[in-house]
Amino acid sequence: MKIELICTGSELLTGKVNTNAAYIGSRLSAIGFEISLVTDVGDKKQDLLREFKRAFKRSNIVITTGGLGPTFDDITVETAAECLNLKIYPDEKVLNSIKEYFLKRSVAASIPKINEKQANIIRGAKVLENRVGTAPGQMLHFKFKDSEKKYRKTLFLLPGPPEEMKPIFEENVEPFLKSYSVGIKKNGVLHVFGIAESAVEEMIKPVMEEAVSGDSKFVEFGILASKSVIDIKFSVSGTDELFVDETISKLKLGFGNVLKDNIFGFDNDTLASVAGRLLLENKKTVSFAESCTGGNIAAAITDIPGSSLYFKSSVVTYSNESKMKLLGVKEETLTNFGAVSKETVKEMAEGVLKLSDSDYAFSVTGIAGPIGGTKKKPVGLVYIGSADKKKTESFKFNFSGTRKDIRKRTVNTALDLLRRKLIAKHSY
């Protein structure tokens, strides 16, 4: 079964991320389907008409997002109807629901004329209730002629705003597709940090080969790297749920045996959430002294609900003066070794440990670029310090990429050092 997605809106052609496509793709994958093609199209009628004709010819199910609003450039309904040579009509029930929407919110006593357009339904389509906004979805079964044959197709028209699209998709599109599903498909993600992508691929190769040795159609793999975090994505399908679950367990065990502590989490885990969980389990607290990251480590930590139970403070000391005044870094240290040095980063860690009275303290200083680098200290040079009541350490790194990349890699590495400290195994 071929499923195609058409996403409308001129904003998609100017660099805006298509989050609807990512969401729909992941939901379909979870129930054993995949999108054969995703097309972004603007608000020109002739372009959308062309894509409808192509999609109806090659796919069994076509899903659209966007173009159901009240303005002149919302043309999905009328264009789909024209392509299929069908009429549209104002649905009285939809008109009433739009009226109720405005009355409940005290926006207007009657429907604005412009919104009446959203009650236009393609003849023969089923209305899919929108409980969040004013534009209902539509589901239409139709026959599309290709040469001399007619094929039964299904069209779903969904709103563009994600908060409106998602409930309609989950309550209507998913149940419809599940009725055609002949098996079970489950997905998983392992998150890896501390080794290169090429090394990861080489290490897990035997595990993957063993997994697909019986029948490769049951197991699929993918590797994605971003800012030193490597995601190993896998999906397992079959008609027996026990087989699927056992295969996933074997995969996780196999990956764990070769990657060991370089695996930091699964599925929705992040370095910050895992570090936070370990701090809670060990009943420990942490503080940070940040220079080149400018508070981004603290931001990552405090993104996690409940982080106040283990996170004490973060001091952003960007200038030499603030390093001396707030953290007690010695002037001679800065003069003799510079702000970006192992000596300075160790004093920063010790300073914030004393200041916060936390169990662990970490510090970062580096040259994020694009200016400021020298032959001895190039852009990307970063030192991370670690201090507790027993000892102080420093770690040196040379990161590549843009300023944003270097800062993000520094944040991730600091959090991973914290994680490894909490599991008492260092691999740096």
Swiss-Prot record:
Transmembrane annotation, as ranges: none
Which Pfam families does this entry report, sorted A to Z? Answer: CinA (PF02464), CinA_KH (PF18146), MoCF_biosynth (PF00994)
* Family that this chain belongs to: Belongs to the CinA family.
Q: Which NCBIfam families match?
A: cinA_nterm, PncC_domain, PRK00549.1
Q: What is this protein called?
A: CinA-like protein
Origin organism is: Endomicrobium trichonymphae
